[in-house]
């Protein structure tokens, strides 16, 4: 029976920058996952002696794979060819060369297995590695056939593995929830949500992940030299694409628009999550109680709340946290550890990010601009809250009275009116508060601390919000207009109180005589009548 040898040459073929930019964030993550997972399969087949391709190294570092695209395909050197010929591996006749990208070869190995991978059952599979020079390593996939047949092979480009199926076809369906996918690998990753499988574990901290790319991204936290820092606000990211998405928050760029409501987003993934509000899609179901969620993060949080064993509990006070980082930060409250000092005023902080934000008080830096009115902010979150003044958005609803709020903290504070609970006591004077932040603000009265100084008149304040309110006295700014009568106010709280004149709302009710008031201070003054009686 005739013998022939088929040689596969692994060359550095990948996406161009233009092709890479056309992929969505999800498709890029999928590409990373397939590449890294298939490489691990190849190593398990061939042994750890296999040298790592450049594209795998780049993906592990969070860099873009198009950075190593080569326009020209490399050729076998005569020296290598003679070496292989001397071993009887490369006969002059019946030798066929097929050029594949690294990840297509790996992908076919994973899908079909090593014995019949790529060409079928008639071929024996062997892997040879040879180094042409000190800069580049090739993988030789040499397969001998005993049938004398020329292999049947239809070449596909790398992009074809990730192209959408015709007419939006999604042939791969999840047996648990019915969700369908265009690519089989997407289904494999999705099924791990239902099974809870997290096969990729970090050797540094033991944290486990469903996808190999997520582990690689996480490991950069331990390797500080592979982190990406924003030059504007010093925020740290483990992936360059995350940094680029974040940088849009400084310039206000939001290129992804929702066709239903017109809301715009910085990142395509945020738009995809938002669209589920309109479609009502909740693809992530809890196997314990059947409750469904729009985001997998919400499901994970829900499952941790139901499973006491998965919580991280403080041994000092018993408070539980959903993640270990939250517990570590909380533990510093008990130890008093504040390792990050401000060089200007000496104030210390538990978290480095708190120091970065605090330093902007001294520098006056406000990197976040409102495109509507030009107002600037030191924090991106403050800009988001401010923009809701222009849009009128109030996403947080009280289930008791159907009142809406711009901030979640405002909702929580408001709900305390209904339940009357004040769990946070001041050890100095015994005064109780509904919110821990209110207690913290109150305690600065006893300490006499006033870290926020007005640059105009040198007056100091306990709270940043007090300084912001005060500064409007110097500028004369009154940004809050009443839509009923046109009256303008310096403070948003003043506008809210004023609007109750038009609406007739009196939310503060006396528990003794049921009399209602527009302002809380009016209720407090009234309650003294009953105490004097």
UniProtKB/Swiss-Prot annotation:
<feature type="zinc finger region" description="C2H2-type 3">
    <location>
        <begin position="228"/>
        <end position="250"/>
    </location>
</feature>
<comment type="function">
    <text>May be involved in transcriptional regulation.</text>
</comment>
<feature type="zinc finger region" description="C2H2-type 11">
    <location>
        <begin position="452"/>
        <end position="474"/>
    </location>
</feature>
<keyword id="KW-0677">Repeat</keyword>
<dbReference type="Pfam" id="PF01352">
    <property type="entry name" value="KRAB"/>
</dbReference>
<keyword id="KW-0863">Zinc-finger</keyword>
<dbReference type="GO" id="GO:0008270">
    <property type="term" value="F:zinc ion binding"/>
</dbReference>
<dbReference type="Pfam" id="PF00096">
    <property type="entry name" value="zf-C2H2"/>
</dbReference>
<feature type="zinc finger region" description="C2H2-type 6">
    <location>
        <begin position="312"/>
        <end position="334"/>
    </location>
</feature>
<keyword id="KW-0805">Transcription regulation</keyword>
<dbReference type="InterPro" id="IPR036051">
    <property type="entry name" value="KRAB_dom_sf"/>
</dbReference>
<feature type="zinc finger region" description="C2H2-type 1">
    <location>
        <begin position="172"/>
        <end position="194"/>
    </location>
</feature>
<keyword id="KW-0488">Methylation</keyword>
<feature type="domain" description="KRAB">
    <location>
        <begin position="6"/>
        <end position="78"/>
    </location>
</feature>
<keyword id="KW-0539">Nucleus</keyword>
<keyword id="KW-0832">Ubl conjugation</keyword>
<dbReference type="InterPro" id="IPR001909">
    <property type="entry name" value="KRAB"/>
</dbReference>
<dbReference type="GO" id="GO:0006355">
    <property type="term" value="P:regulation of DNA-templated transcription"/>
</dbReference>
<dbReference type="GO" id="GO:0005634">
    <property type="term" value="C:nucleus"/>
</dbReference>
<protein>
    <recommendedName>
        <fullName>Zinc finger protein 30</fullName>
    </recommendedName>
</protein>
<feature type="cross-link" description="Glycyl lysine isopeptide (Lys-Gly) (interchain with G-Cter in SUMO2)">
    <location>
        <position position="155"/>
    </location>
</feature>
<feature type="zinc finger region" description="C2H2-type 5; degenerate">
    <location>
        <begin position="284"/>
        <end position="306"/>
    </location>
</feature>
<keyword id="KW-0804">Transcription</keyword>
<feature type="zinc finger region" description="C2H2-type 10">
    <location>
        <begin position="424"/>
        <end position="446"/>
    </location>
</feature>
<feature type="zinc finger region" description="C2H2-type 13">
    <location>
        <begin position="508"/>
        <end position="530"/>
    </location>
</feature>
<keyword id="KW-1017">Isopeptide bond</keyword>
<feature type="zinc finger region" description="C2H2-type 2">
    <location>
        <begin position="200"/>
        <end position="222"/>
    </location>
</feature>
<feature type="zinc finger region" description="C2H2-type 8">
    <location>
        <begin position="368"/>
        <end position="390"/>
    </location>
</feature>
<feature type="zinc finger region" description="C2H2-type 4">
    <location>
        <begin position="256"/>
        <end position="278"/>
    </location>
</feature>
<keyword id="KW-0862">Zinc</keyword>
<feature type="zinc finger region" description="C2H2-type 7">
    <location>
        <begin position="340"/>
        <end position="362"/>
    </location>
</feature>
<feature type="zinc finger region" description="C2H2-type 12">
    <location>
        <begin position="480"/>
        <end position="502"/>
    </location>
</feature>
<dbReference type="GO" id="GO:0003677">
    <property type="term" value="F:DNA binding"/>
</dbReference>
<dbReference type="InterPro" id="IPR013087">
    <property type="entry name" value="Znf_C2H2_type"/>
</dbReference>
<keyword id="KW-0479">Metal-binding</keyword>
<dbReference type="InterPro" id="IPR036236">
    <property type="entry name" value="Znf_C2H2_sf"/>
</dbReference>
<feature type="modified residue" description="Asymmetric dimethylarginine">
    <location>
        <position position="75"/>
    </location>
</feature>
<comment type="similarity">
    <text>Belongs to the krueppel C2H2-type zinc-finger protein family.</text>
</comment>
<keyword id="KW-0238">DNA-binding</keyword>
<feature type="zinc finger region" description="C2H2-type 9">
    <location>
        <begin position="396"/>
        <end position="418"/>
    </location>
</feature>
């Amino acid at each position: 029976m005739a013998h022939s040898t088929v040689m596969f040459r692994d060359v550095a073929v990948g996406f161009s920058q233009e092709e890479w930019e056309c992929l969505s964030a999800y498709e890029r993550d999928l590409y990373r996952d397939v590449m890294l997972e298939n490489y691990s399969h190849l190593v398990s087949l061939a042994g750890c002696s296999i040298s790592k391709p450049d594209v795998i190294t780049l993906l592990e570092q969070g860099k873009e794979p198009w950075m190593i695209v080569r326009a020209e395909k490399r050729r076998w050197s005569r020296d290598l060819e003679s070496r292989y010929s001397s071993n009887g591996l490369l006969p002059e006749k019946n030798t066929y060369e097929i050029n594949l990208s690294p990840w297509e070869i790996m992908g076919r190995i994973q899908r079909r297995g090593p014995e019949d991978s790529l060409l079928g059952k008639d071929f024996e599979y062997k892997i040879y590695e040879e180094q042409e020079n000190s800069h580049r390593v090739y993988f030789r996939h040499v397969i001998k056939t005993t049938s004398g047949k020329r292999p049947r092979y239809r070449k596909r480009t790398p992009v074809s593995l990730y192209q959408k199926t015709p007419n939006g076809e999604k042939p791969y369906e999840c047996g648990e929830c019915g969700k369908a996918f265009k690519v089989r690998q997407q289904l494999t990753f999705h099924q791990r949500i239902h099974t809870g499988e997290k096969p990729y574990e970090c050797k540094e901290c033991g944290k486990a992940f469903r996808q190999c790319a997520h582990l690689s991204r996480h490991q950069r936290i331990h390797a500080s030299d592979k982190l990406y820092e924003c030059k504007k606000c010093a925020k740290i990211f483990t992936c360059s694409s995350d940094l680029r998405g974040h940088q849009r928050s400084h310039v206000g760029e939001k290129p992804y628009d929702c066709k239903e409501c017109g809301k715009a987003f910085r990142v395509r993934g945020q738009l995809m999550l938002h669209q589920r509000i309109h479609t009502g899609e909740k693809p992530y179901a809890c196997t314990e109680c059947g409750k469904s969620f729009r985001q997998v993060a919400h499901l994970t949080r829900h499952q941790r709340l139901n499973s006491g064993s998965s919580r991280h509990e403080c041994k000092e006070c018993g408070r539980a946290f959903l993640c270990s980082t939250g517990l570590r930060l909380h533990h510093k409250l008990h130890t008093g550890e504040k390792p990050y000092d401000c060089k200007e005023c000496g104030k210390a902080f538990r978290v480095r990010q708190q120091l970065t934000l605090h330093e902007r008080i001294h520098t006056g830096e406000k990197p976040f601009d409102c495109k509507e009115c030009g107002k600037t902010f030191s924090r991106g979150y403050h800009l988001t809250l401010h923009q809701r003044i222009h849009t009128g958005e109030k996403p947080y609803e009280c289930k008791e009275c159907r009142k809406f709020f711009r901030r979640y903290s405002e909702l929580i504070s408001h709900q305390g009116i209904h339940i009357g609970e004040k769990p946070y006591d001041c050890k100095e004077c015994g005064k109780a508060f509904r919110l821990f932040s209110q207690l913290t603000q109150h305690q600065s009265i006893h300490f006499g601390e006033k870290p926020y100084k007005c640059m105009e008149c040198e007056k100091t304040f306990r709270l940043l919000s007090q300084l912001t309110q005060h500064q409007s006295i110097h500028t004369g700014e009154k940004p809050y207009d009443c839509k009923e009568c046109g009256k303008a106010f310096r403070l948003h709280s003043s506008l809210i109180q004023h609007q109750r004149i038009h609406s007739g709302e009196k939310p503060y009710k006396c528990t003794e005589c049921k009399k209602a008031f527009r302002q809380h201070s009016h209720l407090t003054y009234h309650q003294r009548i009953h105490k004097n009686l």
